[in-house]
């Protein structure tokens, strides 16, 4: 009898311990379940948005009752913009620059309510402005990544425009494939170009040493880990020279390149007949452009002809800023010496 009671006690004890352990794990798993629920919701929202994007079918958002009548309301469910392709120029006519926000009560977030600018072939334009005013947003609308809420956008066929970001995409392929991207190797062969043609392009961007350094054109590597920041950006310019589009949008794509090499690449691009639209803060690039689109924020912008007196005023302003900074150098040196003395005194 005692033996049976002992067996029952041990068995029940094990069951109770297992139940306690299961309950404990269930309580601790609550945090993981909550995290999974949040991630599932985000993934579902992403997939739903991608399906809507594919079919251009967005749920209409009603205009908020407290929104003033004279304030535009941008709704992805009612896109009124008109896109005209296969033109030989780029023209924005009353195009709002709006950050899309699917499902938000206020619709998109406007950065600029109406942009009007006309870029003919050879009218190289530079886009400047402080952070957050919509410089890159203009390029995204031109590329079709962001919707055209209103107005008219005229532009060439997408094959005639090339976009170069600040950090170019580098695939896990051969060195040759990095230069010809996004074209395939088969398309490269069909074009009739040779490796010597590619070498000439690399010379133009000061990367002629790469084939020897990396082991030839067929070497396959993780190029994003092999190339430096400046080399990556020069590889992006090599792709521009390889494809030779009619228009090129350069979004800070030479920020890690020295000024002299940058100037040579810009000059060569212009010699090829590529119309450049540059997004940058670097005043050294002004001389390669005819137009300046200055986005000032607060729904204001200005289109300046850099061939006129405005260019002189802009350069004079830059020189004034540089002189002001140079005048502060001596004060910075004195402050640095004082800090060194204080540190030396504290250690002693």
Task: Please give the residue ranges for each predicted region.
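ABC-fold ATPase nucleotide-binding domain signature/coupling loops
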Residues: 118, 171, 189-193, 198-246, ...
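Primarily ABC-family ATPase nucleotide-binding module
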Residues: 47-126, 152-157, 271
């Amino acid at each position: 009898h005692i033996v049976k009671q002992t067996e029952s006690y041990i068995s029940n004890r094990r069951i109770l311990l297992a139940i306690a352990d299961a309950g404990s794990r269930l309580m601790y798993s609550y945090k993981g379940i909550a995290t999974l629920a949040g991630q599932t919701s985000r993934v579902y929202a992403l997939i739903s948005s991608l399906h809507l994007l594919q079919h251009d079918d967005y749920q209409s958002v009603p205009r908020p009752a407290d929104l003033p009548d004279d304030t535009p309301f941008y709704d992805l469910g009612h896109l009124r913009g008109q896109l005209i392709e296969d033109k030989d120029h780029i023209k924005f006519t009353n195009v709002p620059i709006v950050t899309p926000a699917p499902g938000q009560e206020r619709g998109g977030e406007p950065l600029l309510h109406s942009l009007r600018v006309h870029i003919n072939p050879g009218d190289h334009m530079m886009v400047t402005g402080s952070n957050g005013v919509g410089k890159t947003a203009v390029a995204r609308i031109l590329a079709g990544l962001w919707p055209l809420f209103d107005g008219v956008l005229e532009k060439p066929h997408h094959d005639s425009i090339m976009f170069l970001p600040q950090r170019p995409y580098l695939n896990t392929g051969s060195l040759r494939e990095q230069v010809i991207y996004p074209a395939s190797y088969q398309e490269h062969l069909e074009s009739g170009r040779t490796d010597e043609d590619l070498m000439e392009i690399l010379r133009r961007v000061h990367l002629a040493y790469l084939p020897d350094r990396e082991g030839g054109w067929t070497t396959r590597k993780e190029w994003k880990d092999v190339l430096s920041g400046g080399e990556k950006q020069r590889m992006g310019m090599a792709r521009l020279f390889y494809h030779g589009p009619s228009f090129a949008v350069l979004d800070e794509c030479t920020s890690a390149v020295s000024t002299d090499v940058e100037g040579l690449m810009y000059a060569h691009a212009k010699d090829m007949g590529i119309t450049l639209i540059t997004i940058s803060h670097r005043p050294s690039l002004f001389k390669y452009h005819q137009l300046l689109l200055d986005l000032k924020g607060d729904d204001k912008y200005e289109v300046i002809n850099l061939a006129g007196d405005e260019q002189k005023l802009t350069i004079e302003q830059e020189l004034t800023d540089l002189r002001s900074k140079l005048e502060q150098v001596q004060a910075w040196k004195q402050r640095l010496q004082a800090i060194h003395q204080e540190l030396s005194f504290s250690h002693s």
